[in-house]
Every structure is written in structure tokens, then in C-alpha cells.
Amino acid sequence: MQYYTAPMEGLTDRIWRQAHQRWFGAPGAPARYYAPFLSPPENRVLIKKKMAELDPAANPGAPVIPQLLAKDGALAAWMVTELRRLGYTEVNLNFGCPSGTVTAKGKGSGMLRDPAKLEAFLDEFFSRTEGPVSVKTRLGVTRPEEFDAILDIYNRYPICELTIHPRVMRQLYRGEADRAAFAACLPRCRMPVCYNGDITTPAQLAALEAEHPSLSGIMVGRGLIADPALLRQAVGGAPASKEELRGYLDELYHGYTALFGASSCAVSRMKAHWHYLIYRFEGAEPLEKQLRKTREGWEYEVVVNQIFTLPLK
């Protein structure tokens, strides 16, 4: 069983990957970091700023898997060629993102609206590229039963691994992941399958492994942002200490300040991390409200110093 980190836009960028690997990485935990999605440019001219996220020199440690968000199979295949020139072997296709700004363009889980278009995309894509390609998907748009037809399509192609997030597009991240629907589809999958969705504790990881020992991997997202040591604990390591969390968060903050050129921009990114992480501190609710109101670096630093006077749960 392998453990992966989910691609989360605005959270699991190269600054985070470097800090997470340094502070909480353990052998095989994670085995792979999936980078947030990259949209291939229609003019086929790569944007240096966006490609910096995937500079191999900026991604040491565990392997990084680029993820593509596209609806044009030929364009996606071209992008795979460019990524392989950088040294990446596996590339992941995103048919799972439920964001309205993404699905309105027919991308992400919006690709699942029309199985015929999905099949046409995969036909075009696989006719133009070779090598390992994985897929991240949802069960459908409105009903889990839609996945029967979607899986029939996936099974026709040389997908090296299928990561299933058992929600439908319309749910976004509301409600619970449909574990029953996930279990029902497993016998029909002709490729290795990875589970993703609502894993927040080492006990949940262990229970999922026991229930589905044939899985190739488990991918964690929001649970790992809330508990950066989650995967380390899954392989027998220690929970995150307050000192580790402080060092990790300081590294993120300074890294984002250097990247964006202003602490105020870094504060915005850090608040996205604290949205999940603050609940690890006992009695932090009043400070959470203060943190949300911060705009400047000095304001952020004052509130964070106060948070770290609290005990961990």
C-alpha cells in the first residue's frame, strides 16, 4: 500500500512540498506528491512562472506527479511530451475537480457530463502519447450510478492507476464520501485503484487498508493539511510536535514571502493552511477569527505567536 498527497490548488505547491518533506516526510510516506493541476496553454507556449512549479530542482525528495486539467486530448498529449522532457515519467489527468469555475469550462469533473466526449478525449490523447498515465476521477455529476458507464470507458485505456474520490461533482466536498459505491466498483476496475476522500486519522488509514487490501494506494488531501504528520504516523512515526509545527509553518510563511515578494501576499496563502490546521490547538476558536482578519505580516505574526501559546489537542 502506497500513500500519496492529493493535488490541492493554493495549498500543495512547491513551497509546501519542500517544507512538508523536510519536517514530516518519512520513507514511503508519502511515496508521491501530486502537484496541483496545470492547464496546457492553447497556444502551446509554456509560461515560465507556471512551469517553475514543476522545476525538478525545486522538487527534491519524494517523486512529484504533474496533473493536467484539459478537455482537448491532442493538447493534453502535447503537454505530456513537454513534461517528459523535464524528466517526468507519470502524468495524471484530472477528471475530479468539482470547482464551478473549472466545470463550467467542461474540465475536471465537468468532463463526466458527457461520456461520449470523455471517450473522444481519451481516444485522441492515448493515440498521441505513451508511457504511464494515471487518472483522478469522481463518480459522476449528480448520481453515483453514473460511474458504471464512466468506468466502462476508463477500462478501455492503458490507465496505470485510477484514483477514485467517491463523491459526485454536485456535492463539491459536502456530505460524506460514498464508501459503498467505491467498494461496489472495485471488482470491475481493470487497473490498480487508489482511494481518495475524507481520511483524517491514522486509524482511518489502517481501517481502509484492512477493508480493501487490494488497493494500490491511498491519497490524502485536507486531512494532511490539518495534520501534516498523518502519513508519518501511518508508518509508525510520531505525531507532530508543537516545535515541528512551528518550524514547518514558519518555513511556509517565509517561503511564500520570498516567492510573492510581500508578506501580505504570504498571509493570504498561510490563512488557507490555518483554515485546516488551527483545530489542532486547544481553545483556538477566538484566535481563528482574529487570524481571518489579518492582512499584513506583522498582524499575522502576532496572532500566530498567540496560537502557539495554546496546547495541542
Sequence positions of predicted segments:
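Hydrophobic faces of well-ordered beta-strands that scaffold small-molecule active sites
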Residues: 3-6, 33-35, 64-68, 91-93, ...
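Alpha/beta catalytic cores of nucleotide-metabolism and tRNA/nucleoside-modifying enzymes
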Residues: 3-4, 9, 15, 120, ...
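Short glycine-enriched, charge-decorated loop/helix-capping segments at active-site entrances
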Residues: 106-112, 235-236
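Glycine-rich, positively charged N-terminal anion/phosphate-binding segment
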Residues: 8-82
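Flexible, glycine- and charge-enriched loops at secondary-structure boundaries
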Residues: 111-115, 175, 242
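Alpha/beta enzyme core
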Residues: 25-27, 78-91, 95-105, 116-191, ...
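Generic structural signal for helix capping and beta-alpha/helix-loop junctions
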Residues: 42, 100, 171-172, 203, ...
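Active-site beta-loop-alpha junctions enriched in small/polar residues
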Residues: 8-10, 38-40, 69-71, 96-98, ...
